[in-house]
UniProtKB/Swiss-Prot annotation:
GO MF: cGMP binding; guanyl-nucleotide exchange factor activity
Annotated protein name in UniProt: Cyclic GMP-binding protein D
An individual GO BP term: cell-substrate adhesion
Binding site for a nucleoside 3',5'-cyclic phosphate 3: 1182-1303
Record-listed a nucleoside 3',5'-cyclic phosphate 1 binding positions: 698-857
Gene: gbpD
Length: 1312
């Protein structure tokens, strides 16, 4: 007798019922049963139990296989065999119609759960097809149609996009955009493809922005994303909805499981990897946010695809005849949106209300969550599920974006505004029932990076704090999210809701792991588990199924959000420590009543008031942020002139180092008044979206006010045309600014015939050791090979620009160029170096701005050399000599040999080519900041108060006492001014320098100013203030009277000697005072004696230069670095791509490579470079401006041309990788450098830095960087980290920017 699995009597071997439950209750009465008994019960009812059927197929793969179920269903459909028992045959005969109908219904559900692996199993497919063929014709056709449709729609378990090769340097900070794919099976009508831009298709048909999707269909679907309902391929659920009750202690168990999962996922490291192997664990990033939301920031799982590069289809025919050389199609590199315009004028900032932002975030997350299918959840391979990974990545990106937006703001007030804005966004998201968004924002606000910003949180209004507390109570983890689960039960069936995905995955993980699929004692199927999991899945999917939001997407808001920058989690943490350190020191300053007497720097320029309007402290001339009691509180008034109302000295700065004081004074006050904050109420809740908004950083230009300070001791000189201002070999000790007219800087570098012959037609071996391989030398050799006269390279310094800035970088270095007047009459301002250096000793912010300004000038000059070199390529009609000296020229104007340092470049500087008039940015002033405007207002009020001329500005101010009256002493260009208050009456005194006979110092921190009328005494708070103020005052006074500063020192020493003869004096103290004064005065005429900086963090040797970063200071900078290793031939930087990073070579060697053909960046900046192309078309499309004669430039090249002398070809090992933000669609970094049309400019070795030009200037990189040694290790530091670090530490910024200026000046000098 054949064993038939059905119609067996119920016993403990095949079914177990729950106690005290009527068996007539159906499956709810069953505790566990065998698979055959389950199918028997499921198919024997008159009406199929659709809810249990759907619930069963959610979890059936945990205890059986599709093939086993198919065999049982076929056996159930055909009935018992003839030799079965009579009872079995009789029972089947009675219910045959019901059974067969139910079996076919179950078959339809089963087919919908099959995946590609199942269809690829021959035995399973053949069993289904054979069974279908045995059915009646009408039923057979219907089932076959469903079967093949499901097979076509089936896909293998989705895999997340491969992460970008960690060795490829990102071209910009990550943005909200990231790449992902969506299967047509799970793609919702809302077009999930359109949620996140940056989607790169294989054929590169995407738009550059990625905002509009990949096709017109996507655009249309996005515009109509609210007009339909969302359907998901899920089983039919019971319409009843009940909240899942979770027992106590569940979260502790989950934390243990999740911790184990995170260790598997991340190897104990940070969150960034999603390559875990545990199929029953939830994504680390989402779950870690669930369990430690209020203890730490969610870990990041970033995919750095914030931009794209597409191939231009119009250029598909370029290089099509070259079969042996790497082909390069014309690549249209779109500069990132963060690139400021060339003229330095930023665009308008867009701003949106929190409600608009919350709505757009809701729409985008709705499109993502409605793409989820039940199979994404039940497969438990969440690390391979594309839709879950999209939501997980989105969750972490939003959380990181919130942190980035807050940390990027410089002042506590600004950070408080952003925090309030995000709390309002979260509140609107709660009203929209987007609880996933609420958790994204709360997860960031409760992270350690944001929660430590106490000074910012203290500025929140009570209304915002109450709102924040309500949100916390709603999403608190207390009672296993009791409040959140309760609010979900109130959501109506037709009301759209976006639940918190992390909690659902946590619940699913718990239910799956705490309820075994088979009972341990009887090995029967656990029916309770099926009900528990199906109920939870039903609750989750029912929240966003068959309903939709009624509002439509706002593309402006979407584009703004997707263009926002997202920083690395670890760097956010480090930057928040810097922010909190700055705010803590500021609070300490206020609590101690420290005014602004020791330094006047603050904000983005050199001087004189803090950002909150405070000035020189808490005396009668104090600065508004410190009152008469020295308690650090303001008077509540908007004192635009920086004056306070106190009558007594405030506390001193004991216990705070000079660096900390500088940090204090450079930071903004966190004690802004409530009245002032309420003035910004209208705009404070409109968040500015600039994804490219430049970070608060040291200004790269000097304002007119700063120029007035720097030119305090300057003199004006008028030169006629042709007059040589400075000549080669002369030692310059000043800096000059052109007031009117212009001068020419002539950089003459001659090459004798022997030097030129090294690269021209002699020597067949081509061993060119000992030759000058600089860019200018190559150009000169090629000019000699064409019998062209030598060309002197130079540039013009126009009105408002400066020259001679090298004197501030080096001491006693002879001039390497001639400075000649090139206009009818030229008026120059000669700025005294000694006074400026004396001022820099205390004005670190002004010093940093000045040296950054010089660095920018050097970077622009270097960039102009590169672009001019490119613009003159290929214009000669004669070919140059080959790299081996064989002179086999070609008509394209380029040598045909492999690229080496001595490659012939052809007629680079043909006389018929106009040189580019590169206008340097030293005359372009940035838009004045609010702080600049405030300072200008203070100067205006100050001039009015003392009746001074309009050219007067406050250089320094000090708290002091005069005639028993506390006040403030101001040092200006022409006067000493004292402002005090006695018995409520203001006392103002002005002492012109030109009416002063002498300035001396005496005991007890007293400086005496002698005039014809009488001697005035000013008592400073400290010796440091006295020495600093005295040194600056003597410099200005001596300049007014043309007195030698050393004579003043001798007078002071004579006075001290006379005083020493009196018994009442203390000789030791006077000698100490004399020594201090001598140091102060000598510092006014020489560079401040700072110890030489060790050679740490740099390769160039600047051992004779002072005021460079020390070893400890370099360690501060290198804290934000990331080490990466590259192999020989790999390209670290691609020309034309913007890199918001700086790099340092730790080990190995790299070659700086310049393309001989204009890059798209060159064409965008200088659209006149290619005006002489053979196709003189008048269109302005720079990306297609290459002439047709250049299409075959690569046809004559040799095989495997290399940019290295050893002829090793460029490695293509990373051909499948992409550069973040710059390259996509299968393009590798190697395809961006054409070895035939490139030349090595220089070599960089251990310790060298690069990327400094991109750090100082906007736009893409001017050169490429290629690894030339076997291996190179580099440190990478993000520019935003460096900007914030330097902005918060002006004393370090001054040294760092001076170092950058020295590096760039050296490179310019080597190329000219």
């Amino acid at each position: 007798m054949t064993d038939y699995p059905f119609y067996k009597p119920d016993d403990e071997t095949n079914i177990i019922y729950n106690i005290n439950i009527n068996k007539k209750e159906g499956f709810s009465a069953i505790k566990s049963c065998s698979l055959a008994k389950l199918i028997e019960k499921l198919t024997s009812t008159k009406q199929l139990h659709t809810y249990f059927s759907s619930a069963f197929f959610l979890t059936y793969r945990d205890f059986t296989t599709p093939l086993e179920i198919i065999n049982l269903l076929i056996s159930r459909y055909t009935g018992p065999p003839p030799d079965s028992s009579k009872d079995s045959l009789r029972l089947f005969e009675i219910e045959v119609d019901i059974v067969q109908a139910n079996v076919l219904s179950i078959f339809r559900t089963l087919i919908g759960t099959l995946i590609q692996v199942d269809f690829d199993t021959p035995k399973l497919s053949s069993s289904i097809i054979e069974f279908f063929n045995s059915l009646p014709e009408s039923v057979k056709n219907e089932l076959f149609l469903e079967f093949f449709k499901a097979k076509k729609m089936a896909r293998p378990p989705g895999s997340i996009p491969k992460p970008v090769n960690s060795n490829i340097i990102s071209s910009a900070a990550s943005t909200m955009r990231f790449s992902y794919s969506v299967s047509p099976k799970t793609q919702s009508p809302n077009s999930t493809n359109n949620v996140l831009s940056g989607l790169l298709s294989n054929n590169g048909s995407n738009t550059m922005n990625g905002i509009n999707g990949t096709s017109n269909n996507n655009v249309n679907s996005n515009n109509n994303n609210n007009n339909g309902t969302t359907n998901i391929s899920s089983p039919n659920f019971d319409p009843s909805r009940s909240s899942m009750k979770m027992g106590k202690g569940i979260m502790k168990l989950l934390q243990s499981n999740i911790a184990n999962f995170n260790n598997q996922q991340n190897g104990g490291g940070g969150g960034g990897s999603n390559n875990g192997t545990s199929p029953q664990s939830s994504p680390s990033s989402t779950l870690s946010s669930t369990n430690s939301l209020f203890n730490q920031q969610p870990s990041l799982s970033m995919l750095n695809d914030d931009g794209s590069v597409q191939n231009n289809n119009n250029n598909n025919n370029n290089n099509n005849n070259n079969n042996n050389v790497n082909e390069i199609s014309t690549i249209n590199v779109q500069l990132p949106p963060s690139t400021p315009p060339i003229n330095g004028i930023p665009g308008e900032k867009t701003a949106f209300l929190p409600e608009a932002i919350a709505k757009e975030l809701t729409i985008m997350e709705w499109e993502l969550i409605t793409a989820l299918s039940v199979s994404d959840i039940t497969s438990k391979e969440w690390n391979k599920s594309v839709n879950i990974q999209n939501l997980t990545t989105w969750f972490n990106r939003i959380s990181s974006w919130v942190s980035t937006k807050i940390i990027s703001k410089e002042t506590p007030e600004e950070r408080a505004i952003i925090i309030e804005a995000f709390i309002n966004i979260a509140n609107f998201a709660k009203e929209l029932k987007n609880y996933n968004c609420v958790m994204e924002i709360l997860g960031s606000l409760h992270g350690s990076s944001i929660s430590r910003l106490k000074s910012s949180w203290a500025l929140l209004s009570q209304k915002t704090n109450d709102m924040f507390q309500i949100l916390n109570n709603l999403m608190t983890t207390d009672g296993n999210f009791k409040n959140y689960r309760k609010i979900l039960t109130t959501v109506l069936p037709n009301e759209p809701c976006i639940p918190y995905l992390g909690l659902f995955l946590t619940d699913y993980t718990y239910l799956d792991e705490s309820n075994p699929s088979l009972s341990t004692d009887s090995n029967l199927i656990n029916i309770d588990r099926i009900f528990l999991i199906s109920t939870r899945v039903q609750e989750f999917f029912q929240l966003f199924t068959n309903c939709n939001y009624t509002f439509i997407s706002n593309m402006s808001v979407r584009d703004a959000i997707l263009g926002e920058k997202v920083w690395d989690e670890n760097e956010i943490f480090r930057l928040s420590k810097i922010r909190e350190e700055t705010s803590s020191l500021q609070s300490l300053k206020e609590s101690n009543g420290i005014g602004n007497s020791n330094s006047t720097s603050g904000g983005s320029s050199s001087s004189l008031v803090n950002k909150d309007g405070s000035g020189g402290g808490g005396g009668s001339g104090g600065g508004g942020s410190v009152n008469s009691k020295g308690d650090g509180k303001g008077d509540g008034k908007d004192n635009r002139d920086g004056r306070g109302d106190g009558n007594s000295n405030c506390g001193n700065g004991s216990g705070i180092s000079s660096k900390d004081k500088d940090l204090l004074l450079s930071s903004s006050s966190s004690a802004a008044s409530h009245t002032v904050r309420r003035k910004n109420f209208v705009t404070k809740y409109r968040m500015s979206f600039t994804g490219n908004d430049p970070l608060p950083s040291v200004s790269s230009t000097l304002s007119e006010r700063e120029w007035k300070i720097l030119t305090t001791n300057s003199k004006t000189i008028i030169y006629p045309r042709g007059k040589t201002v400075l000549s080669v070999g002369e030692t310059n000790t000043n800096i000059y600014r052109v007031i009117s007219g212009r001068v020419k800087v002539e950089t003459l570098k001659s090459f004798n015939s022997s030097d030129a012959d090294l690269g021209a037609g002699g020597g067949g071996g081509g061993d060119n050791r000992g030759e000058d391989n600089s860019l200018m030398a190559i150009k000169a050799r090629n000019r000699l090979s064409l019998n062209l006269p030598a060309q002197d390279d130079g540039y013009y310094v126009e009105e408002g620009e400066i020259f001679g800035q090298e004197s501030f970088l080096y001491t006693d270095r002879p001039m390497l160029s001639n400075i000649i007047v090139d206009s009818g009459e030229c008026e120059l301002m000669e700025i005294e170096k000694s006074f400026v250096l004396q001022l820099f000793a205390s004005e670190h912010q002004l010093s940093a701005t000045f040296y950054k300004f010089i660095g920018v000038i050097q970077a622009q000059l270097l960039k102009s050399i590169y672009i001019n070199f490119t613009s003159n390529y290929g214009n000669g009609g004669s070919g140059g000599s080959g790299s081996n000296g064989n002179g086999g020229g070609s008509s394209n104007g380029a040598g045909g040999g492999g690229l080496s340092s001595s490659v012939s470049i052809g007629n680079l500087n043909s006389p018929n080519i106009n040189r580019i008039d590169f206008k340097r940015r030293s005359t372009i002033f940035e838009t004045p900041s609010s702080l600049d405007i405030l300072r200008d207002g203070n100067d205006s009020s100050f001039r009015t108060k003392f009746g001074l001329s309009q050219d007067e500005v406050i250089i320094k101010r000090y708290q002091c006492k005069h005639n028993n009256m506390n006040g403030t002493l101001y040092i200006t260009k022409h006067n000493l001014c004292f402002e005090g208050k006695f018995l409520g009456i203001n006392k103002n005194k002005t002492i012109p320098f030109d009416r002063t006979d002498k300035i001396l110092t005496v005991d007890k921190n007293i400086m005496t100013v002698t005039t014809k009328e009488k001697v005035k005494k000013f008592t400073f708070k400290s010796h440091d203030d006295l020495n600093e103020g005295y040194g600056i005052s003597v410099q200005i006074w001596a300049n007014h009277l043309n007195i030698n500063v050393k004579q003043q020192l001798q007078l002071q020493q004579q006075q001290l000697q006379q005083q020493q003869q009196q018994p009442s004096q203390q000789p030791s103290q006077q000698q100490s005072q004399s020594s201090q004064l001598q140091q102060s005065v000598s510092a006014s005429s020489t560079t401040p004696p700072v110890p030489n900086s060790p050679k740490v963090g740099r390769g160039e040797s600047f051992s004779n230069i002072k005021d460079l970063p020390s070893k400890d200071e370099w360690n501060q900078i290198l804290k934000g670095t990331k080490p990466l290793t590259f192999k020989k031939g790999e390209i670290l930087i691609c020309e034309g791509v913007e890199y918001q990073k700086m790099f340092q070579i730790v080990k190995g060697e790299c070659s700086v490579v310049k393309s001989l053909l204009p890059t798209p960046l060159d064409q965008n900046i200088f659209n006149n470079i290619n005006n002489n192309n053979n196709n003189n078309n008048n269109n302005n499309n720079n990306n297609n401006n290459n002439n047709n004669n250049n299409n075959n430039n690569n046809n004559n090249g040799n095989n495997n041309n290399s940019i290295f002398k050893n002829n090793s070809s460029i490695s293509n090992t990373n051909s499948n990788t992409s550069i973040d933000g710059g390259v996509g669609g299968g393009l590798s970094p190697q395809t961006l450098v054409d070895p035939k049309n490139s030349v090595i400019v220089s070599k960089l070795t251990h310790g060298s830095i690069f990327g400094e030009m991109s750090f100082l200037l906007p736009g893409g990189s001017a050169t490429s960087l290629v690894v030339s040694s076997d291996e190179v290790e580099v440190y990478i530091i993000e520019s935003y980290f460096l900007h914030i670090l330097l902005k918060s530490k002006p004393y370090l910024a001054s040294k760092f920017y001076k170092y950058l200026a020295c590096v760039l000046e050296t490179r310019v000098r080597n190329l000219t």
